[in-house]
UniProtKB/Swiss-Prot annotation:
Source species: Bacillus cereus
Name of the featured protein: 92 kDa protein
UniProt miscellaneous comment: Under acid-stress, this protein is expressed at a higher level in wild-type B.cereus than in the acid-sensitive mutant strain NB1.
Superkingdom to which the source organism belongs: Bacteria
Lineage start: Bacteria, Bacillati, Bacillota, Bacilli, Bacillales
Length: 10
């Protein structure tokens, strides 16, 4: 799982 696109990039 990863944070929304903007806060972080994964």
């Amino acid at each position: 799982a990863h944070p929304p696109e903007x806060l972080s990039i994964a």
